[in-house]
Amino acid sequence: IVAEPRNASVKRKDGKFVVIKEKTGYTLNMNETFANFKKAVEAEKHQFELDVVKKKAKYTSKDMAEIKDVLGTYTTEYGGSPYGRKVNVANGASKINGSIVYPGETLSVYKTVSPFTKENGYALAGSYENGQTVQTYGGGICQVSTTLYNAVIRAELKIVERFPHSMTVHYVPRSADAAIAGTHKDMKFKNTFDTPIYIEGKANGSTITFTVYGKKKDPKRTVEFLSETTQVKESSESTVSDNTLAEGQKVLESYGHTGY
């Protein structure tokens, strides 16, 4: 008898939205039900009525039918990536694809795409760690969060959390990236609109695209973002003593990186 209500939903099929109807929930009014039971016992009756209360879904089919406008979209290229990285970009996009964010809700990219394991569809590929590139499961997932970030800011949604990479990335202009790493770097955004939004993610082996759908308040409004470098910091040389090397021997651990 007890069942939680389910909000209406949508899915994309053949380039169109299909609305999935909401479901009414049910719960028992325990006080009234117990009172009915007590009366039945006192009257030596074998039956009594359950006081069932309906719980309506918060968002109905009418609300979901409002999702039809493109609020923001963005595409990045990854066709030249190694096989493992391509696998990770496509896998990450598929996990975010179809996400519905209701008004007031916050979507965490890290929670949506993790864990970064072989069992969860990820492969080994390069990722940034302590100023170096190392092989990890899920390497390249930051291109997924970055592409979504750029679609989200064009939809003018609120960014709750966003971090830049420790080094520059090639697939977006400087300052347009959004890194995720463990639980200490995430990309989160909040639906500050009064209608639900739908996230579509597509990866075809060459490009990844995220599109945010919802209800556009002003069809004539457009937004544009510019990347401007205000300061350049050249790298410096750092020498570390290593007793395992022969006297006078030097080994290059890593190249320096220009900061911006």
Residue map of PLM features:
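Well-ordered beta-sheet/strand-loop patches within structured domains
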Residues: 1-260
